[in-house]
């Protein structure tokens, strides 16, 4: 019995050559619409879909393959006599191979000029139905959704007359992943269209970006997946100009770095980061001077760290960075001279280019945190704050310099692991106290790091002070200005302590926990 293939693709890469080889192997080809035209023009003999169904394509192509003569040919089990008899009785020809890819729904909704009606018209119905029918009956039917699988399928058919069961099973699994992802994108689009922010079912789809050697530790397997709807301002979208592949820990640190730098737009800023905590942040009138401040903030911790800059890296800045061992540098661009300097004898240094203005057009994604048996979903902490909304709660008002330093410190504190404390002036971080289980311990760590540079310094806390002992420690160190969210039942104790020592303290009303 002659084998039959049904081919209907939107991605026509390689399909003519694939069909030509099938016909050489004695296969009949059923085809539809534009695919049939392409094959006919290439001299490949095809059977029109309406010759199989006995029913014309209609409703602008919405109805063409949804027919028993198609799905019966796909779903009939070859090992069940009653199925074969039913096919014979109803003159349904068996179909042994399906090659289908779907209407470009994702590409359509990414178009800047997309309309709702256009998106709806690009929802494929017949394609997924054929794929699912063929995949369900993979014991007998081969189903192909990815042109990358054409050589394997052709090779096995040429060698043994049909594909192997393991290949059919693998391809069926790929199809179900593909159709599930396709439906997930459609569901996400409609969910956003109707403004549903707490759907009772959450289905998200990501595409494999990079297999990884291992995860956070060598004993952990890992891979890097990216959002199926690309986000321009992301590590997945960054262009790598030099160095080894990014590791699992590199990607997490790099992601933390670009989250931090996005809050510093107005002035040239450099952030040095280690284990997802900022170890040095500097801002100035030039990117070179901002680097100087970031490096000076903590010249020890920056070793083996990540540096992100919000302006083009010039030769002068590159000359200063080059002697330092860094894992990654991220910037919107590099001068040719700077790139030559940074890559000289530094083949492992990962240099990434990421357009920072891309964040203006990028959707701010939800954050997902896996827990045993579930998933936590939240908005990113990207609230826009205005110092005009802050409240001075002490008798002493901040000076102009203290206001500038507190604004800088508050932006910086947002990305320190809780309990997070950061000490800065208006140019650079001076001390960082991250991730302690009590806040006063974080205060002490930050003070110890900043101890000889506290003149004119301010301190920021990512959450309120539960007790006045924090303020007492701060005052004893000689720091004169504090910025914190407020909100403790003992706020007045902290205010009284600040007044006792002549400190100024500002409440922002916004907490920035980071676990």
From Swiss-Prot:
SUPFAM superfamilies, alphabetized: Cytidine deaminase-like, Methylglyoxal synthase-like
Record has Signal as a keyword: no
PROSITE patterns membership: MGS
Pathway: Purine metabolism; IMP biosynthesis via de novo pathway; 5-formamido-1-(5-phospho-D-ribosyl)imidazole-4-carboxamide from 5-amino-1-(5-phospho-D-ribosyl)imidazole-4-carboxamide (10-formyl THF route): step 1/1; Purine metabolism; IMP biosynthesis via de novo pathway; IMP from 5-formamido-1-(5-phospho-D-ribosyl)imidazole-4-carboxamide: step 1/1
One Gene Ontology biological process: 'de novo' IMP biosynthetic process
GO cellular component, as recorded: cytosol
Superkingdom of source: Bacteria
Gene3D superfamilies with a match to the protein in the record: 3.40.140.20, Methylglyoxal synthase-like domain
Protein name, UniProt field: Bifunctional purine biosynthesis protein PurH
Species annotation: Streptococcus suis (strain 05ZYH33)
């Amino acid at each position: 019995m002659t084998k039959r293939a049904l081919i209907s693709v939107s991605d026509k890469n390689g399909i003519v050559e694939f069909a030509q080889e099938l016909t050489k192997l004695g296969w009949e080809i059923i085809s539809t619409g534009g695919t049939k035209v392409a094959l006919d023009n290439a001299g490949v003999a095809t059977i029109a879909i309406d010759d199989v169904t006995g029913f014309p394509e209609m409703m602008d192509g919405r109805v063409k393959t949804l027919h028993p003569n198609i799905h019966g040919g796909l779903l009939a089990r070859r090992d069940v006599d009653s199925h074969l008899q039913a096919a014979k009785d109803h003159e349904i020809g068996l179909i042994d191979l399906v090659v289908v890819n779907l209407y470009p729904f994702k590409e359509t909704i990414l178009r800047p000029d997309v309309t709702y009606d256009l998106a709806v018209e690009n929802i494929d119905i017949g394609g997924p139905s054929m794929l699912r029918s063929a995949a369900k009956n993979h014991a007998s039917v081969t189903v192909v959704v990815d042109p990358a699988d054409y050589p394997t399928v052709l090779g096995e058919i040429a060698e043994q007359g049909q594909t192997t069961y393991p290949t059919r099973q693998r391809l069926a699994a790929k199809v179900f992943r593909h159709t599930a992802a396709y439906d997930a994108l459609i569901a996400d689009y409609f969910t956003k269209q109707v403004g549903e922010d707490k759907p009772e079912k959450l289905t998200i789809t990501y595409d494999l970006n990079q297999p990884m050697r291992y995860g956070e530790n060598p004993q952990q397997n890992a891979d890097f997946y990216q959002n199926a709807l690309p986000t321009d301002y992301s590590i997945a979208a960054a262009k790598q100009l030099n160095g080894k592949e990014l590791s699992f820990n590199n990607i997490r640190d790099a992601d933390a770095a670009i989250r931090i730098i996005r809050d510093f737009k107005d002035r040239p800023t450099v952030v040095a980061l280690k284990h997802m905590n900022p170890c040095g942040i500097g801002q100035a009138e030039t990117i070179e001077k901002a680097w100087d401040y970031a490096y000076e903030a903590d010249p020890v911790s920056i070793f083996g760290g990540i540096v992100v800059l919000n302006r083009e890296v010039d030769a002068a800045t590159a000359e200063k960075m080059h002697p330092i061992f860094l894992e990654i540098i991220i910037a919107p661009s590099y001068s040719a001279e700077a790139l030559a300097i940074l890559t000289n004898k530094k083949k492992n240094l990962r240099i990434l280019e990421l357009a920072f203005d891309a964040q203006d057009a990028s959707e701010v994604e939800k954050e997902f945190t896996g827990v045993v048996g579930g998933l936590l979903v939240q908005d990113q902490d990207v609230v826009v704050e205005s110092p005009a909304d802050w409240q001075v709660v002490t008798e002493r008002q901040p000076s102009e310099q203290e206001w500038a330093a507190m604004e800088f410190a508050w932006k910086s504190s947002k990305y320190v692991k809780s309990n997070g404390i950061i000490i800065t002036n208006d140019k650079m971080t001076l001390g960082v106290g991250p991730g302690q289980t009590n806040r006063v311990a974080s205060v002490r760590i930050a003070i110890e790091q900043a101890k000889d540079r506290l003149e004119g310094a301010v301190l920021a806390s990512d959450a309120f002070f539960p007790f006045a002992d924090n303020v007492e420690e701060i005052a004893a160190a000689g720091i004169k200005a504090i910025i914190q969210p407020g909100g403790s039942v003992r706020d007045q104790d902290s205010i009284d302590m600040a007044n006792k020592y002549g400190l100024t303290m500002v409440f922002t009303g916004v907490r920035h926990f980071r676990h």
